[in-house]
Amino acid sequence: MDLFGDLPEPERSPRPAAGKEAQKGPLLFDDLPPASSTDSGSGGPLLFDDLPPASSGDSGSLATSISQMVKTEGKGAKRKTSEEEKNGSEELVEKKVCKASSVIFGLKGYVAERKGEREEMQDAHVILNDITEECRPPSSLITRVSYFAVFDGHGGIRASKFAAQNLHQNLIRKFPKGDVISVEKTVKRCLLDTFKHTDEEFLKQASSQKPAWKDGSTATCVLAVDNILYIANLGDSRAILCRYNEESQKHAALSLSKEHNPTQYEERMRIQKAGGNVRDGRVLGVLEVSRSIGDGQYKRCGVTSVPDIRRCQLTPNDRFILLACDGLFKVFTPEEAVNFILSCLEDEKIQTREGKSAADARYEAACNRLANKAVQRGSADNVTVMVVRIGH
């Protein structure tokens, strides 16, 4: 099964004049200079024929997070200047690169989490806006690396917490260094090795306990290498890209990830070939996902830690990335979630706190309001909403 494919890039049309800009709503990136188009080339053939065209709006995703975990937001990111620390706010800026007149779009993550009706928070998340220095990539090929991830634990908090604390560390250690012939192939191999190694580490630790841990976790990670997104996921947590279509003058929800559940044909066939079975839509009638980190008792039954990996070229029409676990999408469709966030970003009544830009305040409010609304709509699961702002 092909694990790596391109998400389609929309056809370019001239950016709208001032009149059209007004139809898109107020300017949300007033602290950012306008970006020029990225030179992305013609691209290769579409390898995933199940992906919707960029203009379609089918896709969604929910993110989850652990309250007990040591927060890693911004950990590993470049240190702020004394002035930024004083203001308590880090401006999102574009990283301009002197090659092919390209512009690296700035990325900044925001998150909100709610325990909901569950007894404990079993979700975890990681926001690393810039880990370029830690990855030490080939300077001539890569100028910016960012990492965002959500993990939805089940059977306990240990697998999701372990993945949140260790997956990006393993990724940094395995990230390509020195001479690289193909960045994309090398990054793909790096992600596959990282997931395999992290799962093996957790299973080794889990099996050494008495009694053995039975925790498991989904994983949805977005690795940004310059303006290319690499999305790796296990299970039913999802990543969604909000992209503006200039022809229709509407925003679309583009799915960046693929859900893994035992009822899907390929997943069920793999489980059955390994000696397992699917009952009531679950592995052995118990486990709801067919790929995960942990879940040692199900790994011999065909459950795997091999992620689906997809690639997406960022464009000037991209607004934000939504990462979330199924707690959100039990009560929100992807389109509803994207439109809810957009309405918050256009709300001029949102108060700007001291030390924060208007854009920061709106994105934080969007995360909090969406998480609250999911709980109000009756989501019985933990709810975590992560939104990654794309600077223009």
From Swiss-Prot:
Its main location: cytoplasm. GO terms for biological process: signal transduction. Residues 1-90 are annotated as: Disordered. The modification N-acetylmethionine is found at M1. One of its GO terms (molecular function) is protein serine/threonine phosphatase activity. Pfam families: PP2C. Binds 2 magnesium or manganese ions per subunit. Residues 72-90 have a biased composition (Basic and acidic residues). Mn(2+) 1 binds at D152, G153. The modification Phosphoserine is found at S13. The modification N6-acetyllysine is found at K210. It catalyses: O-phospho-L-seryl-[protein] + H2O = L-seryl-[protein] + phosphate; O-phospho-L-threonyl-[protein] + H2O = L-threonyl-[protein] + phosphate. Protein phosphatase that may play a role in regulation of cell cycle progression via dephosphorylation of its substrates whose appropriate phosphorylation states might be crucial for cell proliferation. Selectively associates with integrin linked kinase (ILK), to modulate cell adhesion and growth factor signaling. Inhibits the ILK-GSK3B signaling axis and may play an important role in inhibiting oncogenic transformation. This is Integrin-linked kinase-associated serine/threonine phosphatase 2C.
